[in-house]
Amino acid sequence: MNTHLEFFSEKQQQAQVKRIRELHQEACAQFREPGIDLPNTPFELLVRPEKMIICGDFNFTPDSESYKQMTAPILGKTPDLIDAWNTVHPDASRAPTCGVFDHKQWEKGPHCRDYFFLTQNLAQRIQEVSVNIKTDASDHQPIRLILEV
């Protein structure tokens, strides 16, 4: 899933994070108990996976309440969402994903607002998480995740 969360309203942003987590829980519940499949009918079952990768411009920093909400433990049998960067680089400073070149818009300077979050059951497949801080093609820097298939 790719996303671009609210920038101006923290309340709206937290509602978006809440809904992302609810969609993940719904997909996992359906995966565990898929129900009756009626192929080639309007009732054909489209199973959603319990594994999830969500990336994009989340418009929150790693110390924000929205970040804490995104990575908070999920009750029940739903796999938690983890930050891919922290999984690969647990002791490293986070690479900036915005404010590198556009200092007018980002008065705060270089910092992170873009992430790859994925389910904990994909963590062992992460090979690389990197940020290209050399390009000025956008006000955000490209972030890349490589997984073992």
Outline where the language-model segments fall.
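Active-site regions of metal-assisted phosphoester/phosphodiester hydrolases
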Residues: 1-149
